[in-house]
Curated annotation (Swiss-Prot):
EC numbers for this chain: 6.3.4.20
GO MF term list: ATP binding; ligase activity, forming carbon-nitrogen bonds; zinc ion binding
Catalytic activity line of the entry: 7-carboxy-7-deazaguanine + NH4(+) + ATP = 7-cyano-7-deazaguanine + ADP + phosphate + H2O + H(+)
UniProt keyword annotations, A-Z: ATP-binding, Ligase, Metal-binding, Nucleotide-binding, Zinc
Pathway participation: Purine metabolism; 7-cyano-7-deazaguanine biosynthesis
Record-given protein name: 7-cyano-7-deazaguanine synthase
Function as written in the Swiss-Prot or TrEMBL entry: Catalyzes the ATP-dependent conversion of 7-carboxy-7-deazaguanine (CDG) to 7-cyano-7-deazaguanine (preQ(0)).
Protein source organism: Methanococcus maripaludis (strain C5 / ATCC BAA-1333)
Record bears the keyword Disulfide bond: no
Amino acid sequence: MKAICVLSGGLDSAVTSLVAKSENYDITTVTFNYGQMALNQEIKSAEKISEILNADHHVIDINFVKEFSKSGLNTGNIPEPEKEDLDDFEKSEKTMKAVWVPARNMIMFSIASGFAEGIDAEKIFSGLNREEGVTFPDNTPEFIERFNKSLEYGTLNKVKMVAPLYELNKPEIAKLGKELELKLDLEVIKYSYSCYRDNGEDYLHCGTCESCMRRKRAFKEAGIVDPTKYLVE
């Protein structure tokens, strides 16, 4: 069985790749270059994780997105929320809008679908999850359902996108990742990269962007030692 894993190198996609590995899929991983500030770090993480999982890794260039994106992920204007803001819907929604890349997931998953059909893979594994689905509309079960409906008409082999984490929050994702590492006797999570910035050192996180804040909280609430190095703890 073949599968494509959309692998940004972050915690969610790293754990999703472990899920695919645990289900005995022959994995091909894809990382997208959409002109994001953290691109080099994301690629390094994705390459390392792919190597550990014995997966072919491809970087796909969709850098044209940068031409019309005003996202902080492209411009470097990254919001730095307070810890108590993470569960405040209005503040989280404001942060979401600041980093929203126009139609990013739609573009990436559409290309991944073509890749999957081309290599006769039956599934696309994505790291969409419940916590990010609160504010990001393209992380919701509704998005997954409707995207898969379009694949019924847009692909001949009826490839399907799956999101094994869509019912989980970040602490549950961290916990699942640790369980899968032990089950598969692999070490992946410490090589994942969640930060919105490139901090000039491999796997070094800023510790202040929303993604870093959620990562910190995930390990703490899961009761798991955080293997991440942060500029600001």
